[in-house]
Every structure is written in structure tokens, then in C-alpha cells.
Regions:
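Exposed alpha-helical structural elements
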Residues: 29, 64-67, 105-108
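Short C-terminal domain-edge/linker segments immediately following a structured domain
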Residues: 42, 66-68, 88-90
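Generic detection of intrinsically disordered/low-complexity segments and helix-coil linkers/edges
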Residues: 13, 42, 48-51, 77, ...
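Polybasic, low-complexity binding patches
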Residues: 22-25, 45-83
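Short flanking/linker segments adjacent to small metal-binding domains or redox-active Cys/His motifs
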Residues: 73-125
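Immediate flanking context of iron-sulfur cluster ligation sites
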Residues: 1-38, 45-53
């Protein structure tokens, strides 16, 4: 049975195969879709409740979930929602940090390229 929240997921608008890459990188664009999704917390919660072994759920790959599921299972039921909500927030922060690092790298490359072009101009004059 598909939960009602699943219909509101961003993942419904893209190829389902993207969520089941064998070795996804945290730099993979699908993680960004997850952390911006309106049902990220519900998705992440279900993946922990069901101990999903495959795929990206709520912005987290299977290998990451695998090591956290035992911690989740040890939590009392009344603490699990808060734990999942905090985990989702950390994933959103991680995504923002990854994007900031990519932007900083891009800006450094642009600056180096400009400096190289200037050097080429002054050297050929």
C-alpha cells in the first residue's frame, strides 16, 4: 500500500530509477530534490520504520541508513519523530554546505581562468 504522503513527493515527477543507483554520491542531484521535498520527513521516517535496504529515501542513501537504523530502533517511540525531524534538518544543512563548496570551487576556477587570460594578454603584448 502506498502512503498518501507519497503522492505529494517530488520524486513522483522524475524517473524512479534515479532513486535506486547502486552507489549514489552525496553530490548526486537527487539528494537535492529530496531535501527540498515537502514530504522529506515522512519519507525518511518510513525508510527507517521499514528498514529500507535500497534506494534514496528522504535525502539519505541506503548505506547511511544502514548504520543509523539500529540507533533509531533503540529510541523510544515518542522520541522517534523528533529524531527523524532533526536528521532531516541535518541533511538539508549538508546539502547547503555541499552547494556552497561547489560554488566556492567554481568561483576559484573562474578567478584562476581570468588571471590566466590576463597573463596571456600581457605576455603576448
Amino acid at each position: 500500500m502506498i502512503p498518501e504522503w507519497h503522492e505529494r513527493g517530488t520524486c513522483r515527477q522524475v524517473d524512479p530509477e534515479l532513486w535506486f543507483e547502486a552507489y549514489p554520491s552525496k553530490y548526486d542531484p537527487v539528494f537535492r530534490l529530496c531535501v527540498e521535498c515537502p514530504v522529506q520527513v515522512e519519507c525518511l521516517r518510513q525508510s527507517f520504520d521499514d528498514a529500507e535496504e535500497f534506494g534514496i529515501w528522504g535525502g539519505m542513501g541506503a548505506h547511511e541508513r544502514e548504520r543509523l537504523i539500529p540507533k533509531f530502533r533503540k529510541k523510544p517511540y515518542y522520541e522517534r519523530d523528533t529524531w527523524i525531524t532533526n536528521l532531516a534538518a541535518r541533511l538539508r544543512n549538508r546539502d547547503a554546505e555541499v552547494r556552497a563548496r561547489k560554488e566556492a570551487t567554481y568561483q576559484r576556477q573562474l578567478a584562476a581562468n581570468r588571471a590566466w587570460k590576463e597573463e596571456q594578454k600581457s605576455g603576448s603584448a
